[in-house]
Amino acid sequence: MPTYALLGATGATGSAILRCLLASPPPDLDLNILVRSKQKLLKSFPTLTTTISPRIHIIQGNSTDTIALQQCLEDASVAFMCVADNASNKGVSLTADTVTAIVTTLGMLRKLHGSAYNAPTILQLRSASLNPKLSCQVPRLVYNIVSFCLHYSHLDIVKACEHYEAAAAKGLLSYIYVDPPTIHDAFGPNRTGHKLISCKPDVCDKQETALSYADLGAGFVEIASRKEDFLNQPVGVTATGKAKETWGVLAGFLFDGAKGRARAWWEEERPMSKPQNLFLYCGM
């Protein structure tokens, strides 16, 4: 019987994955869920306490707590890694810190189980902006604006990916990077259809601009069922129907990220005199 682990089930992505698994669970599935607040999870999903299929095991703890992670990852063949920080500020490291703790925990489990250890496949939410074969489909101005505003969040994810790749080389895990476009309609339950995009070809299939969280969650679940097709690779997810677009929310994230970049610039340049700052900023 398979065991899945879900890290971060109260955010938009984790909630979408959980809704999909509850609606159509794989046969005989055990689902370990790691959350900071069990109360918050049950408020969103009150039926979890009586759900029979899949069998639910809720672990309350921080995503960097190796004891909680060991309970969550024990016997898991697939782990959905949805822990992230929406704030793109200098020094953000939640994703990388969580992955570091995951790798440490898997090392403990391999030492505990020895030759019986089975390396799980970690499905990591990433972004099409970090996938050259998908980002090349985006107008350069849009790509540059997004990359500027989400710079620190992207750095956090890139560092996390470096940890995955080093751990995979040691046989601790396999990974799959899940690369959506802009994601909309957080916590909306309605799916309109999705398709996976293989990034093996030199030229990928077209990725639509907007994808709903509900369809992203379904994409994650499909990738888990087809993990052998995508091991240690990125895979795109695109919409096949019309997603409910919530550009105002995304604009807010970009604006906050731009403020984070400006704040970091100001902190770095503050010791200098104002005239020097102005000259450097203008390229003089």
UniProtKB/Swiss-Prot annotation:
EC number: 1.-.-.-
Signal peptide: 1-23
Disulfide feature: none
InterPro entries in UniProt: NAD(P)-bd_dom_sf (IPR036291), Polyketide_Oxido-like (IPR051606)
Pathway annotation: Mycotoxin biosynthesis
Enzyme class: oxidoreductase
Residues glycosylated per entry: 62, 86, 190
Reported induction: Expression is positively regulated by the dothistromin-specific transcription factor aflR. Dothistromin biosynthetic proteins are co-regulated, showing a high level of expression at ealy exponential phase with a subsequent decline in older cultures.
Gene Ontology molecular-function annotations: oxidoreductase activity, acting on the CH-NH group of donors, NAD or NADP as acceptor
Keyword set, alphabetical order: Glycoprotein, Oxidoreductase, Signal
TM annotation in the entry: none
Described function: Averufin oxidase A; part of the fragmented gene cluster that mediates the biosynthesis of dothistromin (DOTH), a polyketide toxin very similar in structure to the aflatoxin precursor, versicolorin B. The first step of the pathway is the conversion of acetate to norsolorinic acid (NOR) and requires the fatty acid synthase subunits hexA and hexB, as well as the polyketide synthase pksA. PksA combines a hexanoyl starter unit and 7 malonyl-CoA extender units to synthesize the precursor NOR.
The family this protein is said to belong to: Belongs to the avfA family.
Protein name: Averufin oxidase A
Source organism of the structure: Dothistroma septosporum (strain NZE10 / CBS 128990)
Gene transcribed to yield this protein: avfA
